[in-house]
């Protein structure tokens, strides 16, 4: 936290509907962070292949798309994680999963999922293979 004052001049937070904002801007970003929920459920409109394609066009070359994914049933149900990773793999060349404990907010497991077209190096990633992948999330429109 001591480093935050040094980053304030470089950090710009935007509070808006993420998908609508990205659709309406020509700006490009080094990172886009998706940590959105409707109650305990993820905001599906930001997790679909259509939304991720919009986000990708808003990233600088080599930029990183980061999303927080919460499991259900005390970490037993990772179906949304599997679908989110599957969908990200359709849009980005490289997708990694990093487990994040969140004991202060309950028993659910959190995962940080990072995607980019550039291979970045991250520690403590969870390996996965094609058997882990499930369904591509799509708009219902």
Each model region followed by its residue ranges:
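Soluble small-group transferase modules, centered on the S-adenosyl donor enzyme superfamily
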Residues: 94-141
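Alpha-helical scaffold elements adjacent to nucleotide-binding pockets in ATP/GTP-utilizing enzyme cores
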Residues: 83-87, 111
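The AdoMet/dcAdoMet-binding core of the Class I SAM-like
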Residues: 1-66, 74-81, 89-91, 106
């Amino acid at each position: 936290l001591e480093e935050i004052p040094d980053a304030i001049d470089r950090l710009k937070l935007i509070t808006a509907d993420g998908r609508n904002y990205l659709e309406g801007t020509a700006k490009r970003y080094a990172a886009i962070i998706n940590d959105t929920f409707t109650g305990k459920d993820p905001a599906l409109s930001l997790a679909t292949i259509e939304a991720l394609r919009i986000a990708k066009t808003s990233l600088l070359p080599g930029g990183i798309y980061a999303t927080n994914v919460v499991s259900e049933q005390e970490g037993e149900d990772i179906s949304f994680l599997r679908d989110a990773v599957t969908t990200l793999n359709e849009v980005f060349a490289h997708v990694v999963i990093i487990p994040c404990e969140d004991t202060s907010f309950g028993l659910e497991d959190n995962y940080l999922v990072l995607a980019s077209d550039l291979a970045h190096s991250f520690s403590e990633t969870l390996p996965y293979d094609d058997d882990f992948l499930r369904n591509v999330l799509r708009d219902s429109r």
